[in-house]
Swiss-Prot record:
Database matches in InterPro entries: MetalloPept_cat_dom_sf, Peptidase_M13, Peptidase_M13_C, Peptidase_M13_dom_2, Peptidase_M13_N
Function description: Peptidase that cleaves SIBLING (small integrin-binding ligand, N-linked glycoprotein)-derived ASARM peptides, thus regulating their biological activity. Cleaves ASARM peptides between Ser and Glu or Asp residues. Regulates osteogenic cell differentiation and bone mineralization through the cleavage of the MEPE-derived ASARM peptide. Promotes dentin mineralization and renal phosphate reabsorption by cleaving DMP1- and MEPE-derived ASARM peptides. Inhibits the cleavage of MEPE by CTSB/cathepsin B thus preventing MEPE degradation.
Protein name stated in the entry: Phosphate-regulating neutral endopeptidase PHEX
Cystine pairings recorded for this chain: 54-59, 77-733, 85-693, 142-406, 617-746
CDD domains, per the entry: M13
Free-text cofactor note: Binds 1 zinc ion per subunit.
Length: 749
């Protein structure tokens, strides 16, 4: 076969590409070294006579990378984020198709480029597993823009002609079979079909996850669902921005209905009612600050839920959502089945609202949400209308390239297949060894500070905190099960993709995703396993398993620097991220879970009160940061958990780094990087800042403040380092400088 004979050509291409890369690195390194030597000769940079310098290619590369990011005209004690990041931000403007851009999105894009290359390789029946062949076919169908344009809206209209998907606003404009009937409308049937077949959660979010108070067991959970707009407050506020977003959403709903065949005046009338309904739903949603672990844990059986909220057939809904052909052992779900109802008051209010609302409006809203979720899978005329909407709410001015959209889709639809493809080529197993060094260093640092510097926690609580810290399990790179081809092939055996039917392929993946979590119901939680996509550029803490997780996608420069680079760079970047995730086990939410992952009080009352008192300092510190780009102050209470993790992680990683210097180098500092005059401690803090370099459009800035779990990047950097005396020592920041909070510094861990 032709595809089988291409391997030698591909190898040749790789060899040529490798030669070009080596040449570029050599030439680039020579230029950097030459520049450094010139600057030294001119007295503009100095090489300290008593210091050892590293002139290896890796060190020259690192020095060049740092020089390209910094702005030496800014005083690091006045604004360290600008000092560290201005150069990078200036050289990396926000792409027109993105609402924000930074080092995280930059690395995400580089991972996507690698996945694109892997997915575009011709299918080899000999080399590629069945699952990988399916991933390539799915990608090919997504890239088949000619077929997508030819299909236009036909696949969606086919769905809209059948119950329960008939859209009232379309009336008889798509044929008599598409006419909605109030008499035949069933809220339960519609909600169950959306969730069970299309993975669309509207009004109600039903899913399976570990029981917070019995973390070895899985349980059904019920929660409020999302809205059309990302920010709940945009339905409630009367600010100019919020009004413009609601207006843009309304026009988008109207135009989408018209594109699908609705009469414009009918669409305008009906969508006003739809928007009013969604505003009512936004009003009753439980805000983030009230969604505490304790408040969200309301365990009861379905019979008790039905007695509390009798307006809805909860048992009937759950049984219709779960496909018992896939899971025959779940046929016996009965009124005695336990569920965790995370938002009881929301559900009471929801069915009060729905009980007084016209069925036609409810149906229009439900189908709108299904249509909205499928717009990315339609032809260009729908994409361009979405872009007009995106201009208002995100500030983007162009669509993502089709390949980028397709890679993102395949990655979300078949994460473990794509993850294996990535890991096989781009993940080096020796990274696990260095990550173990970093994890154990952070673990030691946390316990060391707990024993030597924590004066507010009593001995009993401190003992349990150390037990939990010792029990934290680190997962690195990828879950082992993705390497089991037989297992992954079997998991996808029911899926049959066609290169000519992208929309149909999407529907298959939605059904697969819709049913996947029910696999775990009635099964024990595998505490040593993890289920994170290996290509994810992020890291995580899981309270229910007491795990910290670092996927392969995250373990790349400038986050993870190999052993051939100064350790200061890795400890400052991925090391702080390790500390950040580790500290999540002891933040305002994670601290409530014990070493086994159970929501079980293990703090003394006295220690808990002192913890809460100390958090007030951090809440006030971050709440006082005003972001001009967003026109808003940071929400210190909303971002508290992440701010605790940032501050604790920074301290832990720095202490771990200094221990590494003492243990591995007998206290001798690492060789310095040439020409940039930064000490190793300064490089540590620069590396911390560099992975958080980011810039935002005003729309994205506003959204980040409104719903982001993290503080904006500049305040993440400046907030944590201004609380840390070791930073002030490293950069000689005087007591009255902005980056030295002195006696006002906040600290928990």
């Amino acid at each position: 076969m032709e595809a089988e004979t291409g391997s030698s050509v591909e190898t040749g291409k790789k060899a040529n590409r490798g030669t070009r890369i080596a040449l570029v690195v050599f030439v680039g390194g020579t230029l950097v070294l030459g520049t450094i030597l010139f600057l030294v000769s001119q007295g503009l940079l100095s090489l300290q006579a008593k210091q050892e310098y590293c002139l290896k290619p890796e060190c020259i590369e690192a020095a060049a990378a740092i020089l390209s990011k910094v702005n030496l005209s800014v005083d690091p004690c006045d604004n360290f984020f600008r000092f560290a990041c201005d150069g990078w931000i200036s050289n990396n403007p926000i792409p027109e198709d993105m609402p924000s851009y930074g080092v995280y999105p930059w690395l995400r894009h580089n991972v996507d480029l690698k996945l694109k290359e892997l997915l575009e390789k011709s299918i080899s029946r000999r080399r590629d597993t069945e699952a990988i062949q399916k991933a390539k076919i799915l990608y090919s169908s997504c890239m088949n823009e000619k077929a997508i344009e030819k299909a236009d809206a036909k696949p969606l209209l086919h769905i809209l002609r059948h119950s329960p998907f008939r859209w009232p606003v379309l009336e008889s404009n798509i044929g008599p079979e598409g006419v909605w009937s109030e008499r035949k409308f069933s809220l339960l049937q519609t909600l169950a079909t959306f969730r069970g077949q299309y993975s669309n959660s509207v009004f109600i979010r039903l899913y399976v996850s570990p029981d917070d108070k019995a973390s070895n067991e899985h349980i059904l959970k019920l929660d409020q669902a999302t809205l059309s707009l990302a920010v709940r407050e945009d339905y409630l506020d009367n600010s100019t921005e919020a009004k413009s977003y609601r207006d843009a959403l309304y026009k988008f709903m109207v135009d989408t209905a018209v594109l699908l065949g609705a009469n414009s005046s009918r669409a305008e009338h009906d969508m006003k009612s739809v928007l009013r309904l969604e505003i009512k739903i936004a009003e009753i949603m439980i805000p983030h600050e009230n969604r505490t672990s304790e408040a969200m844990y309301n365990k009861m059986n379905i019979s008790e839920l039905s007695a509390m909220i009798p307006q809805f057939d909860w048992l009937g809904y759950i049984k219709k959502v779960i496909d018992t052909r896939l899971y025959p052992h779940l046929k016996d779900i009965s009124p005695s089945e336990n569920v965790v109802v995370r938002v009881p008051q929301y559900f009471k209010d929801l069915f009060r609202i729905l009980g007084s609302e016209r069925k036609k409006t409810i149906a229009n809203y439900l189908v709108w949400r299904m249509v909205y979720s499928r717009i990315p899978n339609l032809s260009r005329r729908f994409q361009y209308r979405w872009l007009e909407f995106s201009r208002v709410i995100q500030g983007t001015t162009t669509l993502l390239p089709q390949w980028d959209k397709c890679v993102n889709f395949i990655e979300s639809a078949l994460p473990y297949v794509v993850g294996k493809m990535f890991v096989d080529v781009y993940f080096q197993e020796d990274k696990k060894e260095m990550m173990e060094e970093l994890v154990e260093g952070v673990r030691w640092a946390f316990i060391d500070m707990l024993e030597k510097e924590n004066e507010w926690m009593d001995a009993g609580t401190k003992r349990k905190a150390k037990e939990k810290a010792r029990a934290v399990l680190a997962k690195v790179g990828y879950p082992e099960f993705i390497m089991n081809d037989t297992h992954v092939n079997e998991d996808l055996k029911a899926i049959k993709f066609s290169e000519a039917d992208y929309f149909g392929n999407v529907l298959q993946t939605r059904k697969y995703l819709a049913q996947s979590d029910f696999f775990w119901l009635r099964k024990a939680v595998p505490k040593t396993e993890w289920f994170t996509n290996p290509t994810t550029v992020n890291a995580f803490y899981s309270a229910s398993t007491n795990q910290i997780r670092f996927p392969a996608g995250e373990l790349q420069k400038p986050f993870f620097w190999g052993t051939e680079y100064p350790r200061s760079l890795s400890y400052g970047a991925i090391g702080v991220i390790v500390g950040h995730e580790f500290t999540h086990g002891f933040d305002n939410n994670g601290r409530k879970y014990d070493k086994n992952g159970n929501l079980d009080p293990w703090w003394s009352t006295e220690s808990e009160e002192k913890f809460k008192e100390k958090t007030k300092c951090m809440i006030n510190q971050y709440s006082n940061y005003y972001w001009k780009k967003a026109g808003l102050n940071v929400k210190g209470k909303r971002t508290l958990g992440e701010n605790i993790a940032d501050n604790g992680g920074l301290r832990e990683a720095f202490r771990a780094y200094r221990k590494w210097i003492n243990d591995r180098r007998q206290g001798l500092e690492e060789p310095l990087l040439p020409g940039i005059t930064f000490t190793n401690n300064q490089l540590f803090f620069l590396s911390y800042a560099h992975v958080r370099c980011n810039s935002y459009r005003p729309e994205a800035a506003r959204e980040q403040v409104q719903i982001g779990a993290h503080s904006p990047p500049q305040f993440r950097v400046n907030g944590a380092i201004s609380n840390f005396e070791e930073f002030q020592k490293a950069f000689n920041c005087p007591p009255n400088s902005t980056m030295n909070r002195g006696m006002d510094s906040c600290r928990l861990w």
